[in-house]
């Protein structure tokens, strides 16, 4: 019995001891799992089967508690492991530092953008004004090549050919360039300021306006054309009335300027024909020559006024095109230059026919460049001025051109007796002037 009870007691003690050993090993196994979990990113190695008396098993105990603490810390902040979280914190700090650096760069870039904008405005003005001076100076230089010096019998045939070319250019400019662009303001002169504004305005024109508004716009263009014709007629009638009382007192003076304006050869011929010229000057037909010369001078100044307004609209177009971009500005400049060369030659012929010398006519033509410069400046200073100005300036100028071509230039071609070949040359010159405007309008 005693032996049996002792054996039973030993068995119970053995069972208790084995349970404690199993519990401790299970606890150490769970802790090792936690340590391994804590060291999954740190790279530390744990001995999974170590006993509690092993020094190797007891050494990482503090590290395990430290890493478990880190694990709890990371769980509170970012639900991540301590090492990964601390690395993420450093990364975030570096990112914040980079953000401040970018902010500093943004301030520097804004200053550079402002300075670049100022430089771009200076370049814009230089390009636009330079293009305007180019379209004014190039035709002026071409006038030196024209052999006509003044309104004399020696150059009369060539002058009539140039006048025919001028009438064709004026009529073609009015009906193929000015009036169509006044009817469709977004085609050339009011291409303004940016592609967005063009698209907006085009959309408003196509969808927002009714047929009644379009009809009213066409009516207004037609009225402005008629207004230009009537205005030029009124100005010429008014000047005739002012000069009408002085026609008899200055009956001999117009012939003197013609002799001064002529070449030296004409002066020599005038001296040889001294008596014949005096007899002719005393006859009654001189009154008609005086009246025609005074009328032609008035029409010459009217042509200058029309040319001034036309150059103003060209300046508006150049300024608006350079606001869009340098490439658009260059194309517009070339187009206007091709258009201005024949136009200026015709205006020069009209001024010479009105009694001006070649030098005076060239100087007056050069003064009209002020209108182009004024138009360019207005277009650059106020971007929306192009639409408002071309709404009435273009058709009004077209009316002036029609009046000058039909009332002033064409009657000069019908005056006097011309040979068949001379008349053919005049008609061909007129058609050539119209044809040049057709080509320019086609490729514009």
UniProtKB/Swiss-Prot annotation:
Domain of life: Eukaryota
Keyword rRNA-binding: no
Any GO BP annotation: zinc ion transmembrane transport
Catalysed transformations (reactions): Zn(2+)(in) = Zn(2+)(out)
GO molecular function: zinc ion transmembrane transporter activity
Keywords: Endoplasmic reticulum, Golgi apparatus, Ion transport, Membrane, Transmembrane, Transmembrane helix, Transport, Zinc, Zinc transport
Loss of function: phenotype: Morpholino knockdown of slc39a7 protein causes neurodevelopmental impairments, decreased head size, smaller eyes, shorter palates, and shorter and curved spinal cords, as well as a reduction in intracellular Zn(2+) content in the brain. These morpholino elicited phenotypes can be rescued with Zn(2+) supplementation.
Gene Ontology cellular-component annotations: endoplasmic reticulum membrane; Golgi apparatus
The UniProt record lists the keyword Cell membrane: no
Compositional bias segments (type: Basic and acidic residues): 61-93, 103-112, 185-208, 267-279
Region (Disordered): 24-112, 185-214, 245-292
Basic residues composition-biased segments: 38-50
Subunit field text: Homodimer.
Protein family (similarity comment): Belongs to the ZIP transporter (TC 2.A.5) family. KE4/Catsup subfamily.
Function: Transports Zn(2+) from the endoplasmic reticulum (ER)/Golgi apparatus to the cytosol, playing an essential role in the regulation of cytosolic zinc levels. Plays a role in maintaining zinc homeostasis and organism development especially in eyes, brain, and gills.
Protein name: Zinc transporter Slc39a7
Biological source species: Danio rerio
């Amino acid at each position: 019995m005693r032996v049996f009870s002792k054996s039973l007691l030993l068995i119970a003690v053995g069972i208790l001891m084995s349970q404690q050993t199993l519990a401790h090993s299970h606890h150490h196994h769970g802790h090792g799992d936690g340590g391994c979990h804590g060291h999954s990113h740190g790279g530390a190695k744990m001995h999974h089967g170590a006993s509690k008396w092993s020094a190797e098993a007891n050494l990482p105990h503090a590290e395990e508690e430290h890493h478990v603490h880190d694990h709890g810390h990371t769980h509170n902040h970012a639900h991540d492991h301590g090492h990964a979280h601390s690395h993420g914190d450093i990364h975030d700090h570096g990112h914040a530092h980079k953000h401040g650096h970018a902010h500093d760069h943004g301030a520097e870039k804004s200053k550079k953008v402002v300075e670049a904008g100022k430089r771009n405005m200076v370049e814009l003005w230089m390009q636009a004004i330079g293009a305007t001076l180019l379209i004014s100076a190039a035709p002026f230089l071409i006038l030196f090549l024209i052999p006509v010096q003044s309104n004399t019998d020696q150059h009369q045939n060539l002058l009539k050919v140039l006048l025919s070319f001028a009438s064709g250019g004026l009529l073609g400019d009015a009906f193929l360039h000015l009036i169509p662009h006044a009817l469709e303001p977004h085609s050339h002169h009011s291409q303004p300021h940016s592609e967005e504004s063009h698209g907006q305005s085009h959309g408003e024109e196509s969808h927002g306006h009714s047929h009644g508004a379009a009809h009213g716009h066409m009516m207004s263009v037609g009225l402005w054309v008629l207004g230009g014709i009537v205005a030029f007629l009124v100005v010429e009638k008014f000047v005739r009335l002012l000069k009408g009382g002085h026609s008899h007192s200055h009956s001999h003076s117009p012939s003197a300027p013609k002799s001064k304006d002529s070449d030296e050869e004409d002066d020599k011929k005038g001296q040889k024909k001294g008596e014949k010229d005096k007899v002719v000057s005393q006859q009654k037909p001189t009154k008609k020559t005086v009246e025609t010369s005074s009328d032609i001078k008035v029409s010459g100044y009217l042509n200058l006024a029309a040319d001034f307004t036309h150059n103003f609209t060209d300046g508006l177009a150049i300024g608006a095109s350079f606001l869009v971009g340098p490439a658009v500005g260059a194309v517009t400049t070339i187009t206007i230059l091709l258009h201005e060369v024949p136009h200026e030659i015709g205006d020069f012929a009209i001024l010479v026919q009105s009694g001006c010398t070649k030098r005076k006519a060239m100087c007056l033509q050069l003064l009209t460049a002020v209108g182009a410069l004024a138009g360019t400046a207005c277009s650059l200073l106020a971007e929306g001025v192009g639409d408002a100005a071309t709404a009435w300036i273009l058709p009004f100028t077209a009316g002036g051109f029609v009046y000058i071509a039909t009332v002033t230039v064409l009657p000069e071609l019908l005056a006097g007796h011309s040979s068949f070949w001379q008349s053919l040359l005049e008609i061909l010159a007129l058609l050539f002037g119209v044809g040049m405007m057709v080509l320019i309008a086609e490729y514009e």
